[in-house]
Amino acid sequence: TPNMSDEQKQRIRMHYKRSFLDYDPRQGMSELIQDGINRNPDMKPIKKNSRISLKDTQIGTLTNQITFVSKAIMRLTKLQALFFANSPFTQDAIATGWADENSEYAKQYMNEDLSWSKMESLTDVELYNCPNMTRLPEFIFDLPDLQLLNIACNRGIKPDDILTDWQKLADDEDTGPKIQILYMGYNNLEAFPPHESLKKMVKLGLLDCIHNNIKTLNPFGTEVKLSDLKLDYNQIEVIPDDFCAFTDQVEGLGFSHNELKYIPNIFNAKSVYVMGSVDFSYNKIGSEGKNINCPMSEFKGINASTITLSNNQIGTFPTELFASDSPISTIDLSNNRMTSIPKNSLKPKDGNYKNTYMLTTIDLRFNKLTSLSDDFRATTLPYLSNMDVSFNCFSKFPTQPLNSSQLQAFGIRHQRDAEGNRILREWPTGITSCPSLIQLQIGSNDIRKVTEKLTPQLWILDIADNPNISIDVTSVCSYIEAGMYVLIYDKTQDIRGCDALDIER
């Protein structure tokens, strides 16, 4: 397209990011929480995953038989974007000769001064999924204004070679200071180039290195400000404190599926800019007995609204995040090793931390919690609206969050002791008086007789898989019949007062 506008060019540049990289980490939270978030007009809705499905081209699969690219391509001096994908050519077969040196066309332009260095309009290059390439082609380093380079899915390039080529790219005076977007996912990269090279990439904004074998991260330094960073699915153990800085346009950062043992100290909770999300799921945080690897006074917190720490080894609630005034509204701590959240986990002995009040959504499923402290009362969390403590070890209903006037959804399904016995037996009397609560999931427990009168305000109720429950739903039967009350139940349960439920007697 001649004379592409900046908007058109940006839309093309971000297509790969939208298709392969973008995801909302809140998709890993419980259905109850996702439903609560999507019902709340004040919260950003959770988008469905838009990643490419398995029906699309897989790594190593070819879609054409291009084995040679004529040097005639260098005559296209106004070319703005050059995309090759799923092709069998090698790096030496790109514009290194004529298709037929004896052709009239080749003879006509044989003596023309053709050079990649003259292609000043060519800013975007993609060499995607070309399995026969063993190095980056030399022409890449001659382009005078390369801004985007997509070299994802080139697994024919060995670890040392792709590292050498990246370092060469950074050191080159033409490419290093100008590249803004670098897609390098699904390769064999094991380490980053040295800091002396990386610091030259001063305009780099987006870096994608997902699904590599990276173990060693060298820092860019804080002069390089990234707006998007994806390092998921690697083997990274440590992120240097001076790894990089971030712009005010960060939507999401991905560090999931690595070997991190501590929450990195590369952010700053005191920044006026709040990032969308930071994902640390599926790491080893907490495995050394602590969540950070520095004194509390030196931990800078995280300036993000959503922080995902699920599927780690956290045994102690990450108070460090709140004590450092991180502006967190949603936190996912599911699938960890916490047995309790003691007093002063969310607040100091006197008063409150500056930004803890912003917390609205907490996922604590799949831990071994037996109790909650008074930190979860409205005096500390006045805007708490969605909370799920299912798959824990509560023998008593934790009533602390129920005094929040904003609480809309609460889950406490499947509470078991170490032997797998059902241990939650008592109905939380008074729960129907919670001013904003519309959904309660208390299924898969051993709730016995319920004497409380149900109200239509709490209109989503899960009591299924409570084999000994006895409950009267007369007060909400008309709403059930009208389809205005969602009761999740078993037909074999002792539920009375509504023939519409077709209970087996």
Q: Which stretches of residues belong to each language-model region?
A:
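Conserved hydrophobic position(s) of the canonical leucine-rich repeat
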Residues: 49, 66, 79, 122, ...
